């Protein structure tokens, strides 16, 4: 696909998921949430061999999602419904792994991601997994359009902060070029 449309492998992975949940419903309905999430993870990790990606486009490892899911389950075991905010959500893999652990709960996921490519991929992932994600394509350090959250999770990015003008206002921002997001 990337030779046909000139988009990156990550963007085309989103388009491939869109095709599956739009045109191949029978295939999708045969798979469990875990099967679909692992298929996404495998495809994402496979594309890393094809394309050099920036560090902040890497997905959160399963172990982090499973541990966070376990902690949320232990601390909020009395809640049947909850709002989870994922700060710097990337492609949404962390929220998907947490949902897998909390499968018996009704969760409204609010994903905050400044990178437009990753925001779009997380929308496709939500549809592919059939998990309700509200994706906010904005900077997590700006005021959030949320009124409530029971839990805030996040796997903070390593790499470049994409908003050069905003980073120049920060103490650790570079005067020229991209600043690091992890400073």
Annotate each predicted stretch with a short phrase.
Residues 1, 8, 138-141, 183:
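Secondary-structure junction/capping motif
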Residues 1-101:
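Class I S-adenosyl-L-methionine
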Residues 8, 32, 60, 104, ...:
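Serine/threonine-rich low-complexity intrinsically disordered regions
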Residues 21, 44, 75, 136, ...:
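Sequence-level detector for tyrosine residue identity
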Residues 56, 75, 100, 125, ...:
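Generic preference for flexible, low-structure residues
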Residues 64-65, 69-154, 159:
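Conserved S-adenosyl-L-methionine
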Residues 155-183:
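Mobile active-site "lid"/loop adjacent to the S-adenosyl-L-methionine
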């Amino acid at each position: 696909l990337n030779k046909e449309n000139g988009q990156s492998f990550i963007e085309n992975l989103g388009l491939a998921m869109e095709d599956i949940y739009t045109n191949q419903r029978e295939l999708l309905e045969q798979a469990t949430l875990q099967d679909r999430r692992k298929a996404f993870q495998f495809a994402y990790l496979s594309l890393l061999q094809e394309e050099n990606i920036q560090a902040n486009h890497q997905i959160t490892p399963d172990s982090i999602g499973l541990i966070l899911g376990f902690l949320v389950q232990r601390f909020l075991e009395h809640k049947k419904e909850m709002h989870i905010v994922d700060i710097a959500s990337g492609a949404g893999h962390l929220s998907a792994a947490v949902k897998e652990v909390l499968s018996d709960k009704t969760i409204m996921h609010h994903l905050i991601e400044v990178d437009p490519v990753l925001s779009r991929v997380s929308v496709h992932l939500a549809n592919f997994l059939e998990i309700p994600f509200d994706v906010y394509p904005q900077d997590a350090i700006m005021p959030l359009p949320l009124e409530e959250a029971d839990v805030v999770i996040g796997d903070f990015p390593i790499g470049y902060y994409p908003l050069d003008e905003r980073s120049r206002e920060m103490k650790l921002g570079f005067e020229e070029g991209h600043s690091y997001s992890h400073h």
